[in-house]
Amino acid sequence: GDSRMFAGKSLRLGGSLQKDGGTGAKCGDLSAILMSNTPKWADMCSTPPRNTALLADWNEKLPRMAEEVSRADVTTLAGVPSWMLVLLNKVLEVTEKDDITQVWPNLELFMHGGINFAPYKQLYEKVIPSDKMRYYETYNASEGFFAFQDTPHSKDMLLLTDHGVFYEFVPMAELDRESPRALTLGEVETGVNYAVVISTNGGLWRYMIGDTVRF
């Protein structure tokens, strides 16, 4: 059917942001820092309002978010599956609805990342019983945005090669050696587990981020 994704709003669920008492510098979760630096026009496409989304106290933030987002026409979700599920259940509690499709009939996409989605899939299908609902995974960290799922028919993710990150891949079987090989993208093989090493335009040089990938 026809998509209404851009006709509604994106529900963004991030962390908290505050100012350091000594220096006045902004500090907080990466998601909150990114949110605080998005252009103002993006707020028109998003819910909840920025001042609510960046609240530091979760006990204050959760019910306030649930009240505010339940009144919006939400078509997409973006966040970590565990925390998003808590919010969705709070929305159902506030609205006294049976499932999320009764609150947001036009909801069709959840862009998730941060943790393995597999243990949450059935829980989401119960809360959002909709055939049109799609789930797309992203792979990012404080060090950079690395990959995202670009097709609904495969769980593979597309590696981003033009986003200021140079990748090297160390075979896990060689990781404990004194001089393991660090392979470029053109040298990797399918079916092999690799430790990810990155150099970035943010200043990281051959930094091992602690993740493993397989092509």
Q: Where do the language-model regions lie?
A:
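Carboxylate/His-rich catalytic cores and anion/metal-binding grooves
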Residues: 2, 6-32
